[in-house]
UniProtKB/Swiss-Prot annotation:
It comes from Trypanosoma brucei brucei (strain 927/4 GUTat10.1). This is GPI mannosyltransferase 1. Coiled coil: none annotated. The gene is PIGM. GO terms for molecular function: alpha-1,4-mannosyltransferase activity; glycolipid mannosyltransferase activity; mannosyltransferase activity. It is an enzyme of class 2 (transferase).
Length: 430
């Protein structure tokens, strides 16, 4: 009760300030950690981006830095790291955490109790250890999550064209937000269903809105992409887009597909060609489950995007820790307490009555436990050269199953919520 009273008295601005202070402390700690420890706190990807920015500032191309495989706009964004001090880029990425929390809170306020909204933002973004670690180590993935949450915030306020424009720009930074196009399109249809009982009118209105949204998204994607292509040519397309389609990572990859990639690499080295393409093997189940989830959870776009992202990460041919920040902030939409739901006789309320906290905690802990299990299994193979391929692949399969079980639980919660009368009234706008 004391904690509940405390969260009631703390404003969102104070929570954001505390989150910012914590991130400043971690960024400062990283400077000393990197000086004294062999394993650096700073992510290697951050060093690559800063090096790319340095090449750009010196009149060259960010792609002059080997393994720079991002949009040049990212290098331009961290240019203060060259002008002022190296950690400036980390401050920019950490600021995206705060922006993500702001937009997440804005969406939550439309259907969740204020206390619950604060708790969710604190738990899944501001003080979440994975989110904290990823952004303060200098990884840019939360920047795209920030834009994805901005899309949902615009959509929740019926600003569909603005949402589409932001989505197109987000896809320019990373390809994966394109998966939100289908649930957003179905969300537009559901909005038209709520606004009119005439089927023909709904179809026409949806077609017009979706067409304009598609045009807005295409323009906001094409403009920066064409400008970057005009400046850096085919190398930009190869590194920023095409590479990620053909990417095969057999190291630091939680996905079970890493073994197939490793065997393919060995066959190519021996000149024997490739038996199976991970792209095709991974894409087919991804497309099926994402389409199915989008349709079943179409009445709640926020829920659909959350479950979609978990499944996308689970079925992706490459999965690393920073990918977790793609979906962790979205969990706030599923575990919040809707404002228009009264406590029931058993003491549960809102979304809390749709699942057992014990069961939910067990599933989350099961998924979380597979992470250190995978790391401890991978270290002997990846750093010491021990031949533990079979053992690591089995652990990767366990991680995949844990992700699927987590997604299944989230989908069950979301479906039960949207099937209730209260969710139709209070959550549909999201």
């Amino acid at each position: 009760m004391e904690l509940q009273s405390l969260i009631d008295t703390v404003s969102l601005q104070k929570l954001l300030l505390l989150g910012a202070l914590l991130r400043l402390i971690l960024i400062a700690y990283a400077f000393f950690h990197d000086q004294w420890f062999r394993v650096k706190y700073t992510d290697i990807d951050y060093m690559i981006v800063v090096d790319g920015a340095r090449h750009m500032w010196n009149g060259g191309s960010p792609f002059d830095r080997t393994t720079f495989r991002y949009t040049p706009l990212l290098a331009a964004l961290v240019m203060p790291s060259i002008w002022i001090a190296n950690p400036m880029g980390k401050l920019i990425f950490a600021s995206s955490d705060l922006g993500a929390a702001w937009y997440c809170y804005g969406v939550l306020k439309s259907f969740a109790k204020e206390r619950s909204a604060k708790w969710m933002v604190s738990l899944f973004i501001l003080f979440n250890p994975i989110v904290l670690s990823v952004s303060t180590r200098g990884n840019s993935d939360m920047l795209v999550t920030f834009m994805s949450l901005m899309v949902l915030s615009k959509f929740a306020r019926r600003k569909c064209y603005q949402a589409a424009a932001v989505l197109g720009f987000a896809v320019h930074f990373k390809i994966y937000p394109i998966i939100y196009a289908l649930p957003l399109t179905l969300g537009v249809w559901e909005q038209s269903v709520a606004a009119s009982t005439n089927t023909w009118r709904r179809v026409v209105k949806t077609a017009v809105v979706v067409s304009i949204c598609a045009l807005m998204a295409a323009i906001s994607f094409a403009v920066p992409t064409v400008l970057c292509y005009m400046k850096y040519g085919q190398q930009y397309l190869n590194e920023a887009f095409i590479y990620h389609v053909y990417r095969e990572d057999h190291r630091h990859n939680f996905s079970p597909y890493w073994l197939l990639m490793y065997l393919n690499m060995a066959r190519r080295h021996l000149g024997q060609g490739v038996d199976f393409s991970p792209r095709l093997v991974a894409f087919a189940p991804q497309a099926v489950v994402l389409s199915f989830v989008s349709y079943k959870l179409r009445r709640n776009t926020a829920h659909a995007c959350c479950v979609q992202t978990v499944l996308f990460v689970a079925f992706n041919k490459v999965c690393t820790v920073q990918y977790f920040v793609w979906f962790i902030p979205f969990l706030a939409f599923l575990f919040c307490e809707p404002k228009e739901v009264e406590d029931d006789e058993s003491g549960g309320s809102g979304a809390f009555k749709f699942f057992s906290w014990v069961k939910a905690l067990g599933v989350v802990l099961m998924w979380a436990a597979t992470i250190p299990l995978w790391v401890t299994t991978a270290v002997p193979l990846e750093f010491h050269g021990y031949s533990d391929f079979a053992q690591l692949w089995i652990v990767s399969c366990l991680f995949f199953l844990a992700m699927v079980v987590l997604a299944s639980m989230l989908a069950r919660i979301a479906y039960r919520v949207q099937c209730t009368k209260c969710s139709a009234k209070s959550i549909k706008v999201a």
